[in-house]
Amino acid sequence: MADSATLDATTVQVLQDLANRLRVHSIRATCASGSGHPTSCCSAAEIVSVLFFHTMRYRQTEPAHPDNDRFVLSKGHAAPLLYAAWVEAGSISEPDLLNLRTIHCDLEGHPTPRLSFVDVATGSLGQGLGAACGMAYTGKYLDKASYRVFCLLGDGESSEGSVWEALAFASHYGLDNLVAVFDVNRLGQSGVAPLKHCTDIYRNRCEAFGWNTYLVDGHDVEALCQAFSQAAQGKNKPTAIIAKTYKGRGIPNVEDAENWHGKPLPKERADEIIRLIKSQIKTNRNLLPKPPVEGSPPVSITNIKMTCLPDYKVGDKVATQKAYGLALAKLGLANERVVVLDGDPKNSTFFEIFKKEHPERFIECFAAEQNMVSVALGCATRGRTITFVTTLGAFLTRAFDQIRMGAISQSNINLIGSHCGVSVGEDGPSQMALEDLAMFRSIPNCTVFLPSDAVSTEHAVYLAANSEGMCFIRTNRSETAVIYTPQEHFEIGRAKVIRHSNNDKVTVIGAGVTLHEALAAADALSQQDISICVIDPFTIKPLDAATIISCAKATDGRVVTVEDHYQEGGIGEAVCAAVSGEPAIHVHQLSVSGVSERNRKPSELLSIFGVSARHIIAAVKYTLMN
């Protein structure tokens, strides 16, 4: 491969020819599928040609090698262009490319990690750069390796605020191994992008965010090579390349024309245009990428053991969010690849304990939750880290799309929500996570933990660290009593029956603070000669349906659920779904019924919303009378 400083005419021609071959592949594939975005592919053909066959270092036969340079296609609708590059690199056959978007083909309309050369799923715009930031941060500060990260964005998606959160993050951490390429083709999906072709405005904005910035003609391969070469020389700043391009480049009467987004060319026109583009190809040569510079350290992130048992005594009063902070610090001792990302509330959520003990593995993302989740997804790619994302549970709702895309990315990130439920008290409704269980229960392959004391919280942290797929741990601000001994064993999907006798009349299921309300209710009811079974589900997803059904049948089908969460999507609905095949089981649900309008103490709010011990007692008596 020629160096950009001595780029010869032959190399320039080969790169231009490769760009045109990428156009041909993209047009053919989208025509074959009858759907797709050929015009979005054509605008970035030269960019991808230069990246894959001149600038990036990688092993073609090992796309996921840890030392390879990374590429993130943030404008995921241009997936055929990415697949075309891998056709030219020899990893995909041309016939396979023609199966684009078919049910048995991994070449989807937007890229996902079902493909070995895709690290994160994209397609929901504005998220690729945040993931690229996570990869670059891992490379620079954790792996201390030579690999670089390139992210291709569309101009339309740069309207997303998450893009600018990522720009701020990369600048703050001096990610000089990161290059963002803005494909400024002027057109969005349904019309003109807000900044049109005003590349100077893009430059000014990127520079204001602390990036080295270069303006280039995005269809000039020589200029692109030079810009990428300059980016490689930059120190302590990320680089933005603002590439002026034209949507549908090379397609007569379509180039720079509106109303062609997401439309394949009619077959008769496509054949003619392919012949035209092919006539401009002067060589049949290819360029091989340079091999990567090896240097990424070997990592092991499986089978992590507790360094010691939880250090709590039954009866100790500890908030589960504090127990989580302490457990995470212990986990950091057990494995040096544990990384924590914080959204700024570390001083009130006990995440600063981890920062104090493992500062080199604590990533402050500030109040930018969307970017924080995207960065975490990037950090976790290629099995480089065990990643925990920490903030108030209410604020994770802002990042739901990033979390959703994380599931599509088959990511193993762990998210922890603190200050959950009305038990936050005087801070008011804006701080109360009351939708979080519904949100995370809806995420495929996501394990949802709801620990009820410090011991179970510590076990939840270790189980999450060793789990495949995404995990969510819900924690509370209120101090609650430790109810389990340090020797207690916990499993995902296995509930704990806390109170049980042969005379139980009703099964009561609570979790977190409401489990303690249920235990208080059980004590009060026992004074009235009414015995109840009390279950701690531990994980809300998967739910231990077998234990719940068994206990419910033993109490003549009478079940009461109580939760510090809205009814929709919460514990009650999860239990109803679990027992839906058992017509003799009837579930009475207690849950938060509305938004708190007043500042009250946690105990007062639990009572106001009908999820206190007093209301559990009333519900038990009601079920016994009906």
UniProtKB/Swiss-Prot annotation:
GO molecular function: metal ion binding; thiamine pyrophosphate binding; transketolase activity
Keyword Transferase belongs to the record: yes
InterPro entries from the UniProt entry: THDP-binding, Transketo_C/PFOR_II, Transketolase-like, Transketolase-like_Pyr-bd, Transketolase_BS, Transketolase_C, Transketolase_N
Keyword S-adenosyl-L-methionine found: no
GO cellular component: cytoplasm
Keywords for the protein's UniProt record, in alphabetical order: Calcium, Magnesium, Metal-binding, Thiamine pyrophosphate, Transferase
Family named by the database record: Belongs to the transketolase family.
Subunit structure: Homodimer.
NCBIfam families: PRK05899.2-5
Name of the protein this chain belongs to: Transketolase-like protein 2
Organism encoding this protein: Bos taurus
Taxonomic classification: Eukaryota, Metazoa, Chordata, Craniata, Vertebrata
Gene name in the database record: TKTL2
